[in-house]
Amino acid sequence: MMLLSSSYSGGQFPGVSPLGTRPKRSTTVVPLPVVTRATAGGVRNNLEVVGNAGTLQGMDIDELRVIVRKQLQGVELSPSSYDTAWVAMVPVQGSPQSPCFPQCVEWILQNQQEDGSWGHSAGPSGEVNKDILLSTLACVLALNTWNVGQDHIRRGLSFIGRNFSVAIDGQCAAPVGFNITFSGMLHLAIGMGLKFPVMETDIDSIFRLREVEFERDAGGTASARKAFMAYVSEGLGREQDWDHVMAYQRKNGSLFNSPSTTAASAIHSCNDRALDYLVSLTSKLGGPVPAIHPDKVYSQLCMVDTLEKMGISSDFACDIRDILDMTYSCWMQDEEEIMLDMATCAKAFRLLRMHGYDVSSEGMARFAERSSFDDSIHAYLNDTKPLLELYKSSQLHFLEEDLILENISSWSAKLLKQQLSSNKIMKSLMPEVEYALKYPLYSTVDALEHRGNIERFNVNGFQRPKSGYCGSGADKEILALAVDKFHYNQSVYQQELRYLESWVAEFGLDELKFARVIPLQSLLSALVPLFPAELSDARIAFSQNCMLTTMVDDFFDGGGSMEEMVNFVALIDEWDNHGEIGFCSNNVEIMFNAIYNTTKRNCAKAALVQNRCVMDHIAKQWQVMVRAMKTEAEWAASRHIPATMEEYMSVGEPSFALGPIVPLSAYLLGEELPEEAVRSPEYGQLLRHASAVGRLLNDVMTYEKEVLTWTPNSVLLQALAAARGGGESPTPPSPACAEAARGEVRRAIQASWRDLHRLVFRDDDGSSIVPRACRELFWGTAKVANVFYQEVDGYTPKAMRGMANAVILDPLHLQQ
């Protein structure tokens, strides 16, 4: 039995219902606020945040959204002093005494820091890092190349001298290829006659680090090493085989979309296409250049991904749709900016599929084999991020035999595990990798993910190859918005929890000693598919029905006598005419009154949304469910084992109880769910696959307990069929046979996940009659089963309580 919950009463829950049977007793019921899209969206002002977003305290929330939206619509990377310096060193062809890009030289002259450096620090304290040293040395070289800015050069050399120890310190984070690029430029500077105020032994130490890098046995293959050496070509200068390097040139004329590498090739090989790329780049951007160009698609996708991870993407839905439309167009045109870059391609594929775009896995074919990684720069650097992106994207396969995604999933998971075990993953990235491997796409709890991402969020940006640290340009604003929304959501959830507790007391559900009635975990189960605050009505209905169906399941699973079961089924069958039946026990009366009155109230709310009565549909779902549970109770009493899986699942799917839970919440999502959609084959498939996932997951986890009582279970059926044993035989299957049967059932679960995934995330091109929000509710509901049945049956584990507390009750712990 799946343990879910969610439904919400928009206002005070009356002590006496005008819609049905009078509740057993009257209590004081906690009122709830009316949560609308406007209030959930955040008309709250004067933001109060702590931790590393504290500088934004008091800002209006709409002002923050404007800043984030502006950055999202036109993501611009910070200028890279390092790359600008290399572009500044390119001479005019045929006139080596003149800079080809004087605007870059001028920008360098105008942007030296007071301490003599160029570049940006990696943290709030402004400490010197290797990126600043690298950028400063490059800018000094650029100015000295054209014999300008002598005072700038002197101050730059002085800064490098004062901080030279940073360059030697192996504990300091370094841009990619630092030991090659810094030493190469140092050699070039010394050749120009520049004097560094440092000891000769320190300079020798830098050159020794260069030799160590050349001799280092890094990751990947020989091809990966060649690609890496091409990428840091500016640090090799005349030592580089520039004809070999040009094999990496892209259609836009660049090398790796890197201005610095491309500028070095223009200097040493006089390549016209490289020069054309730089001309185009500087004409677009003016004086400075970024570390990577073009990079708009990746940067925007990263920001979209960040907004989703932080739980605030709904505030920017239109902007995100525009970005994904543009990305889809680029995907369909097979543009290099997306298709050649591992991380960009994987992230684009994942986000497009998750948002309903029709993208084929053929676009990922170039990464189907592990060699695509082993031969890349990423392998040489043991770069985890592209690997993680590939693994995440591989989870989105709709077909049973999608060999491309299956291969990617297999080899990327293996490599990620190897990196974890060998401690090759950055500490800041380790929690995300561990989480991705432990919790597949269908096992995640969005609200819990949001919390973890908020608490780990780094407002100082992230490190990029050769360019130091970059951010979205709105990191502090993103964090402030996320903290504000999480706090607001928690306040809504906490009011809902108090309401659910008062609802339990009102109907006397706490008097049912046989029943698991746990509001906190029930609300958690509702939050998996329904975490936005404005979905409060749907969430409360979901929570209530989780508790009610769990109560009924416990009743049929030993909590009631056969006489009570027959009486209860008759009451549900008669529904509005239940008065003609009567109650044979106090427990039956409590159960029926709670179900009947709660359903009446929620259906009254749903009628306001749907402009029609939905009671008959919901009552029918209750009738189907209790009949199935009664059949299971009769099977257990007679020790009957169904002859086939078809016979078993015809009862097992409806007894999993999604029928009363999902439809009512779907009616309360705030948009029309037409009757023809509910009656459509598509809706039936969604319900069937979600129910199958839950039922089979439950069976896998409860087999050991149920085989002892000879309770029907899909694992038991598979094991008996494999052993050719009699269905009525009380002899349990052997452990080996049972494990093989578990494997068969797990494969059936995966098949249902794929079918459900395909139905839910299909392209919104009009081919689906069921609204997207309703389809996603089925997906989220199936996820609840996976979350709750990962280890043991149902609500009891301490981990479940901890998860519920983290989402609903516990305050955030932000980085300081």
Curated annotation (Swiss-Prot):
Mg(2+) 1 binds at D553, D557. One of its GO terms (molecular function) is syn-stemod-13(17)-ene synthase activity. Mg(2+) 2 binds at D553, D557. InterPro entries: Isoprenoid_synthase_dom_sf (IPR008949), Terpene_synth_N (IPR001906), Terpene_synth_N_sf (IPR036965), Terpene_synthase-like (IPR050148), Terpene_synthase_metal-bd (IPR005630), Terpenoid_cyclase/PrenylTrfase (IPR008930). One of its GO terms (biological process) is defense response. It is an enzyme of class 4 (lyase). Keywords: Lyase, Magnesium, Metal-binding, Plant defense. Mg(2+) 3 binds at N698, T702, E706. Residues 1-10 have a biased composition (Polar residues). Belongs to the terpene synthase family. The Asp-Asp-Xaa-Xaa-Asp/Glu (DDXXD/E) motif is important for the catalytic activity, presumably through binding to Mg(2+). PANTHER family: ENT-COPALYL DIPHOSPHATE SYNTHASE, CHLOROPLASTIC, ENT-SANDARACOPIMARA-8(14),15-DIENE SYNTHASE, CHLOROPLASTIC. This is Stemod-13(17)-ene synthase. The lineage of its organism: Eukaryota, Viridiplantae, Streptophyta, Embryophyta, Tracheophyta.
